[in-house]
Amino acid sequence: DKFITGLKSFGIGEELTYIKGLSKDTVILVCKPNLFVSTKEVYEGLDLQNIKNRPDNKFLIECLKKGNINLLATNMVNVLETVTSKMHEEIKDIEKVMLENNALGSMMSGSGPTVFGLFDKEEDALSAKGELLKKYNQVYVVRSSEKGVEVNGEFN
């Protein structure tokens, strides 16, 4: 059996350290709008000198360690989102639907366009999924796993 476990990257992603992940009770809604996002353009559009809201990774790691999903969700920040959401308003629209359906927090993943929301109730995530499916095809409700993700097949 092969597993991908909860690892946190540091530096430019080359340093990995194990951290405890979300509890198995956390429901995650993932929505990938049918958009192309150029990672290169997003990074070129990022003004490092004028980033107003940066993630406090040490604090977020402490939230994970303590299992405080509410505090984690309300403090999630993605600095790249300011750039991508200016190019594609759908990012904020998707987050709004998730938050209106009681997501504890929602944000874009990486340079986008995928958006995820953390929920403590599956019925809320399913309600948001139903709304999002009216406009987007790739919408998924999943649960976190304490053991990691099982990968069927071999790593190459």
Predicted feature residues:
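ATP-dependent small-molecule kinase catalytic core of the GHMP/sugar-kinase superfamily
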Residues: 1-105, 118-156
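Conserved glycine-rich beta-strand-loop-beta hairpin in the small C-terminal domain of fold type I
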Residues: 113-115
